[in-house]
């Protein structure tokens, strides 16, 4: 079985998180940039070869529109640059609350976003705390839906806070000086 080099890249919406992720792996982010045009359009570019590599693109889709479009374009660029696999790491999956039709003549936004990611060429999705588990079924590629509660709940319990969630009135009320 061939071993493919792994490279990590960050979208502009998740650079801080991406730097923390790669630091924990003892590596650095790959070299990429986004060219901004005067009309508001932008064009991501990988400034190093990713041919044959497994590429992780770390990008939240909040605020959704520009970050989602940047992620889609980075996926497409990676695919066109002959990446072996393209994995989108999406800490926040925008439009996830639109997981069903709740009234007539409305879209199912989560399914549309899933279709766009697959059409762009993603091979796998990693995301956190999806609004609804059924969203995983909207994709034609594997989805790793991770849950922060597995990390946060044990930590919070370890603090031994007796009255968690019950702040005193004095702590919640702003009193001007």
Per-segment meaning from a language model:
Residues 1-172:
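PRPP-associated nucleotide enzymes
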């Amino acid at each position: 079985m061939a071993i493919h080099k792994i490279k990590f890249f960050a979208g502009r919406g998740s650079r801080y998180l991406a730097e923390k992720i790669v630091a924990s792996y003892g590596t650095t982010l790959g070299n990429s940039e986004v060219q901004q045009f005067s009309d508001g359009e932008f064009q991501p570019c990988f400034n190093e070869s990713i041919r044959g590599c497994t590429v992780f693109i770390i990008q939240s889709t909040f605020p959704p529109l520009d970050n989602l479009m940047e992620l889609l374009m980075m996926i497409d660029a990676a695919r066109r640059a002959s990446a072996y696999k393209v994995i989108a790491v999406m800490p926040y999956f925008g439009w996830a609350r639109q997981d069903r039709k709740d009234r007539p003549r409305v879209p199912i936004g989560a399914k549309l976003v899933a279709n766009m990611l697959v059409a762009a060429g993603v091979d796998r999705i990693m995301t956190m705390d999806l609004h609804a588990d059924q969203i995983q079924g909207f994709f034609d590629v594997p989805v790793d839906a991770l849950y922060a509660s597995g990390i946060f709940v044990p930590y919070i319990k370890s603090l031994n806070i007796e009255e968690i969630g019950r702040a005193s009135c004095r702590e919640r009320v702003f009193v001007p000086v």
